[in-house]
């Protein structure tokens, strides 16, 4: 078993397990189940699966050029001859039936051998591309899932802001009625309440859109989703050095692996094109049988009939040496060489892209964790500020706008904190994808951070 074949078999096993598990739940209750549902229903992944199945046929197609071909031909004819000459007429009528079997076995066809090796590489390339599609599915599901959770948290924060602004509006109105505040305070509170209501409506609409985006991937309307458990800590990348991740990405990134295989295929194509100048040798064998039945009559009372049978077989070698093909073979060789150079440049570009992706994802994780820590402190500070401003307003040392600003600041801090957490979680997956190691185990690890729906 070759390394490519082994990898294909492992991918087929992974695909079978994913499909088997996808039918076990009717709802996308958590991240892991969402991924499994998407593996069965997502249109892009289904297209990638079909392409993977098609790519697996490259190997038997290439092998066919090394195997013998066997053909059978047959014919039947009716003969009718009427010969007129001086003194007599000759009439001959009858059937001739024949068949032949031809066998051809390539002995030396270098183009066919190279094509077979290309088939092995193309099968491996199909497996890598399918793995890319699977990693892309994980990222799309995770992004859509956490987009929903982020939209839910944003809606909750804005709902709380709208309620708080409404309470502050009522307080401003009652204070105005007793003459402790001016009408300006009422108008400010009314403006903040209206703005909070508008933001809440927009957040609800955004949540609906995010739900539909997730439903598009998982193939069904998601029910209640498991949210991130409170107090969950985010782990730093392991290894915790950007250089290690960059090194892994430059060798293990699936885009790099795909381009490496594409380069090998292009190199084989150069070899196959140049092989057009080489001779070919085939073993050929045939067997033929024919049988004729005819009746002959002349200008005499009697007529004669007869049967003729023939059998024959041949076996030998056939050499074909191309001498001149109009320059087509040389042109195809130059074309293949240019495409090989293109594949080499594509590989270099893939390595650079993997390098950048690893750096961006690593910084996304590390800077995201720093942002989460800072925003957690900001949330606590904003909450303390709100309580202090409320107390100051009650005793007359703070004005209405101070309380409104503190409420808005707390809502903003909570929304930014939620987004930073979810962005960091997705960045962790993107870092694994950049290194080429992202798999269902990573989805399960993130899923363990979630509570129950």
PLM region descriptions:
Residues 2-3, 136-250, 262, 364, ...:
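Periplasmic alpha-helical coiled-coil/stalk elements that build and connect Gram-negative outer-membrane
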Residues 21-23:
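N-terminal signal peptide c-region/cleavage motif recognized by signal peptidases
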Residues 26-73, 81, 89, 105, ...:
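Bacterial Sec-pathway N-terminal export signals of envelope proteins
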Residues 27-147, 151, 165, 183, ...:
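Short flexible linkers and secondary-structure junctions
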Residues 73-105, 228-239, 267, 271, ...:
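Small/polar, glycine/serine/threonine/aspartate-rich low-complexity segments that form flexible
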Residues 80, 361, 414-453:
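Acidic, low-complexity, intrinsically disordered peripheral segments
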Residues 176-180, 393-397, 434:
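A short glycine-centered flexible hinge/capping loop motif at secondary-structure junctions
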